[in-house]
């Protein structure tokens, strides 16, 4: 797992550690010291810790003017044992909401498992706080999406179908946002 790095193709235009509005502002990254692990397996040091034992993230891009962010996730999303949505919501999302972000894209190709909970308070709260924005998940494994459906996470997070963008790394973040916004608008019948 230590070889799986967060995407870095946009570091020339955005780095969360250099963004004063980011919850990870001022963070420094060692390329030689591995300090975090998931179930005893060390993970790459560029992933940001959110106080979860099994879920990490990386804010890849945020545009405060257009009010969107793209966040890559890594690990096991475990709401059953660790209430990971609480950690993600309180330690990352709330900071971005306070800065006016209302469009959230979660990249999930490195989320290896999801364990849901009947409690959906944090999802519901987040959904209500984006008001006329949206929350979307792209490139999550099909079995993760099925678990999301089982626990009704699809009430709050848009995912699946044409929201899976396997070529996302080759696109500029603005184009990803515009594409997803168009898809969501079409799904809601606004186009």
What is each PLM-predicted segment?
Residues 73-121:
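A contiguous binding-surface segment within folded domains or other stable secondary-structure elements
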Residues 4-11, 143-191:
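A cross-taxonomic marker for long C-terminal extensions/tails that follow the last structured domain
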Residues 42-88:
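STAS-typified acidic loop motif
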Residues 23-41, 61-75, 162-180:
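Charged, low-complexity, helix/coiled-coil-prone segments
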Residues 1-48:
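N-terminal catalytic cores of peptidoglycan-degrading enzymes
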Residues 89-94, 123-126, 154-158:
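Short, low-complexity, polar/charged sequence segments that are solvent-exposed and flexible
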Residues 63-65, 96-99, 130:
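Flexible, charged surface loops at secondary-structure boundaries
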Residues 101-104, 108-152:
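Amphipathic alpha-helical interaction surfaces in cytosolic regulatory modules
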């Amino acid at each position: 797992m230590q070889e799986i790095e967060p995407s870095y193709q946009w570091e020339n235009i955005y780095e969360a550690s250099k963004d004063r509005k980011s919850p990870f502002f001022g963070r420094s990254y060692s390329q030689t010291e591995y300090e975090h692990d998931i179930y005893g397996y060390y993970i790459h040091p560029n992933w940001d810790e959110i106080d979860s034992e099994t879920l990490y993230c990386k804010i890849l891009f945020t545009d405060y003017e257009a009010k969107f962010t793209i966040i890559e996730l890594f690990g096991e999303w475990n709401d059953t044992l660790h209430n990971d949505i609480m950690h993600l919501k309180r330690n990352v999302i709330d900071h971005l909401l306070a800065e006016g972000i209302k469009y959230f894209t979660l990249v999930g190709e490195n989320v290896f498992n999801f364990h849901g909970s009947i409690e959906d308070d944090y999802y519901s709260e987040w959904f209500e706080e984006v008001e006329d924005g949206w929350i979307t998940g792209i490139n999550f494994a099909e079995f993760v999406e099925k678990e999301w459906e089982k626990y009704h996470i699809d009430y709050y997070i848009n995912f699946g179908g044409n929201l899976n963008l396997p070529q996302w790394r080759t696109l500029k973040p603005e184009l990803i946002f515009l594409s997803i916004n168009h898809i969501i608008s079409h799904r809601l019948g606004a186009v």
